[in-house]
Amino acid sequence: MRVAVDVMGGDNAPHVEVEGAVAAAREFGVPVTLVGDAEKVRAELARYDCKGLDIEVWHASEVVGMHDSASDAVRKKKDSSIRIAFELVKGGEAVAVVSAGNSGATMAAGMFVLKRMKGIDRAAIAQLFPTVSGKTLVLDVGGNVDCKPIHLVQFAVMGEVYARFVMGVDNPKVGLLSNGEEASKGNELTRETSALLREKPINYIGYVEGRDIFNGSVDVVVCDGFVGNVALKLSEGLAEAVGKMLKAEIKSSFLSQIGYLLSRKAFNNFKKTVDYAEYGGAPLLGINGVGMICHGGSNPKAIKNAIRFAHEYALKGVNGRMAEKLNESFPGDAREREGAPAPDAGTERVAS
């Protein structure tokens, strides 16, 4: 089961992607196909000892830039590395795609080439957040800035399956992000969504607040892509700021430096917990295949872990489990009764 890696999309492509892919092949035994400018890719590969590693190179003559329109990039740049990577999955040459490129283009390419799963109107980008007791899955974190209640319900069902079969959580708790836990809080979108969620075969616990993402009280947090992207960028900025504050305090006095030396292991464990590279990337849920969207500034460690997670996702057959849960949650014409638009209606607006 090969993983196709878009090696031309990230801020430091193709160096970071190739190094991460080589590490994934060496440490985890994952077969990888590097998609991009073959000459540049092979030049990067020559820097490593790849003997015995299952690594292939697939040429793609075009690159989707970070400022390219997602829809135009997919339709006009037919030989781009990101589109070719998804075409490999469609053709059975790979089981998953990993990309640190334009997130909107990655999402658009996944939906354009592999199409949405039956029963899904909008694909969603999910992200694991560290908590005091483990991890919380938040979706959507940028795929759809405008959502209808039915979209959030679909996100909840997909998130529940991901938590159960990827995170290993038995009967995961699903919450809807709001400005308070009381039923009277929220807006029209959250109130309508909450009513629908109570009818679904999932462990829906009601409204949750932003702080609940990190306190371990909920396993899956559902929101629209606008709110989710703000939460994601806020957490990234906070983690970076806290790190800088700690460094400044440690350097402020001799006693602080002694204290740091005595607590170095604890500091290193904390740093590892909040390091996005440990999580690799954000899975794109709702397409007929596996897609992993990485941060544009990902380092080799992040790419390596994204490849591992994408490979494990495919091995566990999560999409098949998701299809079963969707059929259970939306039997017959339930989607029409709940006001779902036709699957291809509307255009997703992506937060970067």
Swiss-Prot record:
Compartments reported by the entry: Cytoplasm
Listed GO MF terms: phosphate:acyl-[acyl carrier protein] acyltransferase activity
InterPro entries recorded: FA_synthesis (IPR003664), Phospholipid_synth_PlsX-like (IPR012281)
Transmembrane segments: none
Pathway membership, UniProt: Lipid metabolism; phospholipid metabolism
Pfam families: FA_synthesis
Known EC number: 2.3.1.274
Basic and acidic residues: bias regions: 328-339
GO terms, biological process: fatty acid biosynthetic process; phospholipid biosynthetic process
Region (Disordered): 328-352
Family: Belongs to the PlsX family.
Record's protein name: Phosphate acyltransferase
Organism: Citrifermentans bemidjiense (strain ATCC BAA-1014 / DSM 16622 / JCM 12645 / Bem) (Geobacter bemidjiensis)
